Amino acid sequence: MTHLFEGVGVALTTPFTNNKVNLEALKAHVNFLLENNAQAIIVNGTTAESPTLTTDEKELILKTVIDLVDKRVPVIAGTGTNDTEKSIQASIQAKALGADAIMLITTYYNKTNQRGLVKHFEAIADAVKLPVVLYNVPSRTNMTIEPETVEILSQHPSIVALKDATNDFEYLEEVKKRIDTNSFALYSGNDDNVVEYYQRGGKGVISVIANVIPKEFQALYDAQQSGLDIQDQFKPIGILLSALSVDINPIPIKALTSYLGFGNYELRLPLITLEDTDTKVLREAYNIFKAGENE
């Protein structure tokens, strides 16, 4: 079975200028990603600062990306919230706008149990009838989708993948035992673990760093699929990832997207920009990475 995508899906940032969504910068960024081998684009997720976007802004961003991409790669809309009915309505609207799939985070704050998660995800999948990527990110939600729950959900015809941001390979192996990896894709949600994640059968990554190095990050996946040892190829990327870890995503990555010309270096509160010294160090790390490519 063909998966939704294989390789690098980009968790797209939202460019702002004077606190307004900058559509021209958004288009330029998406064109850059398409020209540099991104395999999917994920819109209105964590990296997009989605909690600070209005419903109208989310729909405008999604429509803009869908129209520009024009079916060249899948556009996946982040529509999950901790309110099932709101998630259903957002998912229905995403489908109406032309999204190829939706991504659903676990519930948060008003946390449920595993049975509640099953009901929540199945209700949305039943209502919208688009491919669904589950999103497990315990560090942000303080709950997980247990392997047994993934097994149940993987039986739903519309639930086709998991974005696994647990950074826990024991979890990955438990999930793998319980699913059909031919029909259900496992994507890493952690850029720094992709070498081992790919070795363990992951079909790709939903990536933050690919906002600025999509071609290089996709080349890593392609090399692994060709049977090459990618440890050395990953090392310079790993150094840049270490520089990106200076603060919470998406604060650092937007210091780089803005450096490439995709909007100002702006975030919406409660997120704030890096200190100037940290911004300078991060951008220099990016310059060193790019210079190393040309040696």
From Swiss-Prot:
SMART domains: DHDPS (SM01130). Keywords: Amino-acid biosynthesis, Cytoplasm, Diaminopimelate biosynthesis, Lyase, Lysine biosynthesis, Schiff base. Pfam families: DHDPS. The active site is at Y135, K163. GO terms for cellular component: cytosol. Transmembrane segments: none annotated. SUPFAM superfamilies: Aldolase. The record marks T46, Y109 as: Part of a proton relay during catalysis. GO terms for biological process: diaminopimelate biosynthetic process; lysine biosynthetic process via diaminopimelate. It is an enzyme of class 4 (lyase). Pathway: Amino-acid biosynthesis; L-lysine biosynthesis via DAP pathway; (S)-tetrahydrodipicolinate from L-aspartate: step 3/4. It catalyses: L-aspartate 4-semialdehyde + pyruvate = (2S,4S)-4-hydroxy-2,3,4,5-tetrahydrodipicolinate + H2O + H(+). The keyword Cytoplasm applies. GO terms for molecular function: 4-hydroxy-tetrahydrodipicolinate synthase activity. It is found in: Cytoplasm. Pyruvate binds at T47, I206. Its main location: cytoplasm. Its EC number is 4.3.3.7. Belongs to the DapA family. Homodimer. Catalyzes the condensation of (S)-aspartate-beta-semialdehyde [(S)-ASA] and pyruvate to 4-hydroxy-tetrahydrodipicolinate (HTPA). This is 4-hydroxy-tetrahydrodipicolinate synthase. It comes from Staphylococcus aureus (strain bovine RF122 / ET3-1).
